[in-house]
């Protein structure tokens, strides 16, 4: 089990609502894991943390994300290309090779309104439904099989 919390870039919810776009000038956190809404400077909410978690889980399994090797003449152009890659990458393709619940988790996160309080119990149960499936990289045996 991994618990990773970074409150260094957290923003408070004001009266239960996400912050406004004018409250910040750039993407919060690493662009590689940031939600599409974060990169578009839209109001952030819990769903953005969950979308970032989904990208982190895919990265932990694969060791890279489809946009990990994106390059461009400027950082701004690179960030735009990464955002576009995320917007066009279907959860089923991004999560290919992972248990089906990962793609569904990402789909639900992306569809959630920014201000909505997630049903954490349901999301946890969704991911737990596939917890018994070993995560394997193509062509590699799991440590327990050696």
Regions found by a protein language model. Name each.
Residues 1-32:
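Activation segment/activation loop of eukaryotic-type protein kinase catalytic domains
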Residues 2-7, 34, 53, 57, ...:
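Structural signal for hydrophobic/aromatic residues that build the beta-strand cores
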Residues 8-9, 13, 38, 118, ...:
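Residues that form ligand- and interface-recognition hot spots within folded domains
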Residues 19, 26, 30, 36-99:
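Conserved C-lobe activation region of Hanks-type protein kinase-like domains
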Residues 51, 143-145:
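Long, extramembranous regulatory segments enriched in acidic
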Residues 54, 58-61, 106, 110, ...:
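Short, amphipathic alpha-helical segments that act as regulatory/interfacial helices
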Residues 97-108:
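Conserved C-terminal C-lobe helix
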Residues 110-138:
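Terminal C-lobe "cap" of eukaryotic-type protein kinase domains
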């Amino acid at each position: 089990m991994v618990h990773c919390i970074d409150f260094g870039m957290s923003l408070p919810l004001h009266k239960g609502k996400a912050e406004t776009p004018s409250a910040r000038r750039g993407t919060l956190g690493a662009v590689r894991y940031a939600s599409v809404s974060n990169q578009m400077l839209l109001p952030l909410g819990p769903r953005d943390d969950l979308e970032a978690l989904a990208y982190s889980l895919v990265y932990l399994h694969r060791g890279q994300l489809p946009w990990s090797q994106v390059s461009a003449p400027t950082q701004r152009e690179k960030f735009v290309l990464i955002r576009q890659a995320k917007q066009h990458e279907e959860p089923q393709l991004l999560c290919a090779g992972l248990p089906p619940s990962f793609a569904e988790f990402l789909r639900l996160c992306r569809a959630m309104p920014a201000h909505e309080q997630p049903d954490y119990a349901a999301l946890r149960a969704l991911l737990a439904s596939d917890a018994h499936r070993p995560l394997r990289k193509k062509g590699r045996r799991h440590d327990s099989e050696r």
